[in-house]
């Protein structure tokens, strides 16, 4: 029976609605707990928030969540004083500081939720196929409120699976990283995926944003 290597679940956040972010972390944690594989995963809330009110609320909410779930030592919170290079820099800082402990990381968005069973499946895929560097899921939009969001959510439900199948066909063994809802092999990502600044002025030069 294959047991997945240790996996980090990382939530990079930036001045978000604190209660909503931590509720998604809570739901994800509890869903993973139900799989019986929680011991193979550790959670990180990686804050780049610039408002002192926000990051103090984040710290208080993190401590409260850990007490509720008895998750000290399994859910970690880090606030970065200088949010250099935005989200990409946030993830890079995690990889340099803590990445050596983990074989894989699942990168979430602040508004992401993923079922625990899906996380376990992703980790097992990486374990079974050591040449895979990244597995990108196909996220679905839920809970949209605005007209544009509702239209986007409908189109996502109506033909999202067909779009993903077509994308997989044309990409073959390669793949695009959308920046979230993906599992990544940490060592390979750290060694080969650092991107340089482009020469010239923005928007065609400077930092690579996406």
Which positions does each model-derived feature cover?
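Internal catalytic domains of large membrane-associated glycosyltransferases
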Residues: 1-210
């Amino acid at each position: 029976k294959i047991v997945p290597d240790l996996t980090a679940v990382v939530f990079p956040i930036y001045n978000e609605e604190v209660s909503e972010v931590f509720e998604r972390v809570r739901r994800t944690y509890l869903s993973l707990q139900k799989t019986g594989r929680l011991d193979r995963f550790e959670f990180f809330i990686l804050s780049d928030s610039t408002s002192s009110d926000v990051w103090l609320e984040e710290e208080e909410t993190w401590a409260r969540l850990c007490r509720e779930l008895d998750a000290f030592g399994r859910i970690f919170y880090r606030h970065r004083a200088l949010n250099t290079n935005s989200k990409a820099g946030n993830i890079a800082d995690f990889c340099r500081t803590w990445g050596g402990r983990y074989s894989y990381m699942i990168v979430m968005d602040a508004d992401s939720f993923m079922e625990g069973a899906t996380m376990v499946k992703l980790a097992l895929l990486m374990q079974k196929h050591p040449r895979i560097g990244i597995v990108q899921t196909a996220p679905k939009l839920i809970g949209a409120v605005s007209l544009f969001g509702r239209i986007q959510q409908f189109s996502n439900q109506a033909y999202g699976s067909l779009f993903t199948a077509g994308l997989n066909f044309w990409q073959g063994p390669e793949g695009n990283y959308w920046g979230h809802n993906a599992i990544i092999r940490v060592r390979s990502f750290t060694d080969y995926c650092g991107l340089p600044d482009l020469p010239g002025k923005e928007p065609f030069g400077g930092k690579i944003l996406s």
